[in-house]
Amino acid sequence: MSDINATRLPHLVRYPPYVGDGTDLTLNRGEK
């Protein structure tokens, strides 16, 4: 279950101010 969780919440865990990848930003803005 740990593996699935880590793969299911990859951008969710680093979505706050961790804006490191351009993809994360796009996913975040699309979800929010």
Swiss-Prot record:
Presence of keyword Cell cycle: no
Keyword list, A-Z: Toxin
Keyword Cell membrane: no
InterPro entries: Amanitin/phalloidin
Cross-link (Cyclopeptide (His-Pro)): 11-17
Molecular-function GO term, any one: toxin activity
PTM section of the record: Processed by the macrocyclase-peptidase enzyme POPB to yield a toxic cyclic heptapeptide. POPB first removes 10 residues from the N-terminus. Conformational trapping of the remaining peptide forces the enzyme to release this intermediate rather than proceed to macrocyclization. The enzyme rebinds the remaining peptide in a different conformation and catalyzes macrocyclization of the N-terminal 7 residues.
Propeptide: 1-10, 18-32
Family note: Belongs to the MSDIN fungal toxin family.
Function of the protein: Probable toxin that belongs to the MSDIN-like toxin family responsible for a large number of food poisoning cases and deaths.
Protein name as catalogued: MSDIN-like toxin proprotein 2
UniProt organism field: Amanita fuligineoides
